[in-house]
């Protein structure tokens, strides 16, 4: 996926926020085909790895599910080693003739680490514990970074508020938000 081309990202916003001992992964429910909303309650955030890992995806749905299945297989091979599983998936994604054609991005997190995975072979861990991908990702990221300094807000509170802001701004993001908490 050309991560510089927002056209490939239409239809999703995924946000991961880590604060204190809590991790919240949120995703909106809108699926768009061109300029048309075809579904408003899609579930783009999932628990994987025996429930110890949360993953969110942006991009082509079939491609994202293929990558999610591959990541689950890597987690079975490398239990409790999210970083290693992500690196192994990224290597496969980059070098496999079939996988490298997949157009999706993933945000994955466990209780201690969070990563963005791209088809370019990137496994990126944020410095501030916040990841955002998809068409509304930059809006959600900016909102979450502003809200992280507010005392008394949990990771879930920040994720929900930032997703609302992203949904207010991005036409490819709606307010039907799914949140998974670790």
Curated annotation (Swiss-Prot):
Keyword presence, rRNA-binding: no
EC code: 3.4.25.2
Highest rank taxon of the organism: Bacteria
Activity regulation summary: Allosterically activated by HslU binding.
CDD domains in the record: protease_HslV
Disulfide bonds: none
Alphabetical GO biological process terms: proteolysis involved in protein catabolic process
Subcellular localization, as worded in the UniProt entry: Cytoplasm
GO CC annotation: HslUV protease complex; proteasome core complex
Pfam families: Proteasome (PF00227)
Record-annotated active site: 12
Its job: Protease subunit of a proteasome-like degradation complex believed to be a general protein degrading machinery.
Similarity remark: Belongs to the peptidase T1B family. HslV subfamily.
NCBIfam families assigned: ATP_dep_HslV (TIGR03692), PRK05456.1 (NF003964)
Quaternary organization: A double ring-shaped homohexamer of HslV is capped on each side by a ring-shaped HslU homohexamer. The assembly of the HslU/HslV complex is dependent on binding of ATP.
HAMAP family from the UniProt entry: HslV
Protein name in the entry: ATP-dependent protease subunit HslV
Gene (name only): hslV
């Amino acid at each position: 996926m050309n991560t510089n081309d927002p056209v490939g990202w239409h239809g999703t916003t995924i946000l991961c926020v880590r604060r204190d001992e809590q991790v919240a992964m949120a995703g909106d429910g809108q699926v768009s085909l061109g300029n048309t909303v075809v579904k408003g309650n899609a579930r783009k955030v999932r628990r994987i790895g025996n429930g110890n890992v949360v993953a969110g995806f942006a991009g082509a749905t079939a491609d994202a599910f293929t990558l999610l299945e591959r990541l689950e297989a890597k987690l079975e091979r490398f239990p409790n080693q999210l970083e290693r599983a992500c690196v192994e998936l990224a290597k496969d994604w980059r070098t496999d003739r079939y996988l490298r054609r997949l157009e999706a991005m993933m945000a994955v997190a466990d209780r201690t680490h969070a990563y963005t995975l791209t088809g370019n072979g990137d496994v990126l861990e944020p410095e501030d514990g916040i990841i955002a991908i998809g068409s509304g990702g930059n809006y959600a990221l900016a909102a979450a970074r502003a809200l992280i300094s507010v005392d008394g807000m949990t990771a879930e509170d920040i994720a929900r508020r930032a997703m609302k802001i992203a949904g207010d701004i991005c036409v490819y993001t709606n307010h039907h938000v799914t949140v998974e908490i670790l």
